[in-house]
């Protein structure tokens, strides 16, 4: 197998404009290659989302998880080359999805092809869990595949997610968990009136200031060795006033918690509503939990990934739970050990998204090394 196989496959995937939740043939490209090396492939499509579950072997299962969808290109003028025409310049591959995460998908596939060629009768089961709904709502993607696996009582012992975890150098950061995310959609009610006659109105903005000061200054928890303390950010405020001489009748506010495993989403809801009542506010509130925190403590998978990075990248990776949510929050429902290991994330979602060719090839070797160590007897 030529040394440029991973680059060629990455280019093929990048050339497909699979803006979320569209797949447009990426998974067919991958599944055809997997079928050629003995994989069984199941399509679990939902609405516009393409989902793929592929597997080979039986027993202890190592799954690779990834997504074929990408974010929109943004302002095309900012790109130095067409975003869906993969371009190599001075050892760097440019294109939308190169880092997040078609490069990692290519590395996974080629790594498995190499491993199977060397060990066609390998121990255990290798699997792929791939969706085209990760960058958008994630309602029809990995969560649906996991739901099907749970119904069938299928197990994933170990899972490598190809999210771009690295920061400065390939392998310098690996994710062994993620914080939870819960969003509040709050409406505070007052009484509309003329701004010159405040005694005849009840300003919901003024009424809520003390509440918001307490909300953002409150210590929700102290975190722990794995997680930073729970934090809250207000990200949208809007009143219903359409005139500069009118006190609004209501104020709508959106805020989001990123929370550790020291607190639950239910605890957060209860504490926020106690604060609202403490400040005697008339309100309505809706909540959306995007995901609960998950954590893979030190164990076989994290040990193997760390050793592989040390051997091939010559650095000691940092274990981290920072950043946003990932599809690991769904896979965690299977009780799997989960590690996120992928390319450098400096250019993800930006114009001129790119990866170094040497990193792409090295990631492929890393994945193959991990597979070999997982299944060695």
UniProtKB/Swiss-Prot annotation:
Family named by the database record: Belongs to the peptidase M20A family. DapE subfamily.
Species: Buchnera aphidicola subsp. Baizongia pistaciae (strain Bp)
Pathway given in the UniProt record: Amino-acid biosynthesis; L-lysine biosynthesis via DAP pathway; LL-2,6-diaminopimelate from (S)-tetrahydrodipicolinate (succinylase route): step 3/3
GO molecular function: acetylornithine deacetylase activity; cobalt ion binding; succinyl-diaminopimelate desuccinylase activity; zinc ion binding
InterPro entries: ArgE/DapE_CS, Bact_exopeptidase_dim_dom, DapE_proteobac, Peptidase_M20, Peptidase_M20_dimer, Peptidase_M20A
Enzyme class, spelled out: hydrolase
Catalytic reactions of this protein: N-succinyl-(2S,6S)-2,6-diaminopimelate + H2O = (2S,6S)-2,6-diaminopimelate + succinate
Function, in words: Catalyzes the hydrolysis of N-succinyl-L,L-diaminopimelic acid (SDAP), forming succinate and LL-2,6-diaminopimelate (DAP), an intermediate involved in the bacterial biosynthesis of lysine and meso-diaminopimelic acid, an essential component of bacterial cell walls.
Gene Ontology terms: biological process: diaminopimelate biosynthetic process; L-arginine biosynthetic process; lysine biosynthetic process via diaminopimelate
The protein's required cofactors: Zn(2+); Co(2+)
Binding positions (Zn(2+) 2): 100, 135, 349
Positions of the catalytic residues: 69, 134
Binding partners and assembly: Homodimer.
Keywords attached to this entry: Amino-acid biosynthesis, Cobalt, Diaminopimelate biosynthesis, Hydrolase, Lysine biosynthesis, Metal-binding, Zinc
Protein name: Succinyl-diaminopimelate desuccinylase
Origin: domain of life: Bacteria
PANTHER family: ACETYLORNITHINE DEACETYLASE (PTHR43808), N-ACETYL-L-CITRULLINE DEACETYLASE (PTHR43808:SF31)
Residues bound to Zn(2+) 1: 67, 100, 163
Cofactor binding, per record: Binds 2 Zn(2+) or Co(2+) ions per subunit.
Known EC number: 3.5.1.18
């Amino acid at each position: 197998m030529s040394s440029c196989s991973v680059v060629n496959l990455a280019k093929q995937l990048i050339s497909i404009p699979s803006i979320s939740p569209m797949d447009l043939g990426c998974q067919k490209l991958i599944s055809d290659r997997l079928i050629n090396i003995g994989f069984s492939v199941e399509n679990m499509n939902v609405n516009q989302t393409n989902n793929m579950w592929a597997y080979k072997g039986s027993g202890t299962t190592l799954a690779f998880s990834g997504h074929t969808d990408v974010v929109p290109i943004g302002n095309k003028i900012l790109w130095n080359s067409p975003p869906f025409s993969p371009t190599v310049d001075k050892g760097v591959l440019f294109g939308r999805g190169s880092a997040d995460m078609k490069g990692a998908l290519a590395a996974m596939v080629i790594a498995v092809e190499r491993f199977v060629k060397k060990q066609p009768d390998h121990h255990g089961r290798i699997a792929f869990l791939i969706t085209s709904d990760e960058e958008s709502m994630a309602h029809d993607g990995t969560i649906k595949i996991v739901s099907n696996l749970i119904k069938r009582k299928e197990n994933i012992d170990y899972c490598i997610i190809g999210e771009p975890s690295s920061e400065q150098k390939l392998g310098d950061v690996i994710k062994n968990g993620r914080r939870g995310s819960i969003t509040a959609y709050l409406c505070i009610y007052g009484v509309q009136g003329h701004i010159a006659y405040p005694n005849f109105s009840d300003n919901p903005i003024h009424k809520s200031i003390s509440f918001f000061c307490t909300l953002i200054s409150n210590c929700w928890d102290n975190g722990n060795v794995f997680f930073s303390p729970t934090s809250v950010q207000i990200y949208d405020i809007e009143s219903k006033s359409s005139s500069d001489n009118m006190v609004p009748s209501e104020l709508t506010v959106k805020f989001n918690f990123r929370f550790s495993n020291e607190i639950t989403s239910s605890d957060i809801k209860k504490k926020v509503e106690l604060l609202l009542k403490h400040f005697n506010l008339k309100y309505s509130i809706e909540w959306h939990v995007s995901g609960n925190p998950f954590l893979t403590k030190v164990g076989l998978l994290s040990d193997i990934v760390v050793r592989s990075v040390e051997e091939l990248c010559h650095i000691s990776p940092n274990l981290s739970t920072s950043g946003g949510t990932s599809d690991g929050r769904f896979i965690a429902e299977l009780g799997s050990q989960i590690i996120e290991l992928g390319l450098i994330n400096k250019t993800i979602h930006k114009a001129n998204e790119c990866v170094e060719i040497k990193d792409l090839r090295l990631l492929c070797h890393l994945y193959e090394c991990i597979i070999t160590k997982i299944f060695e007897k």
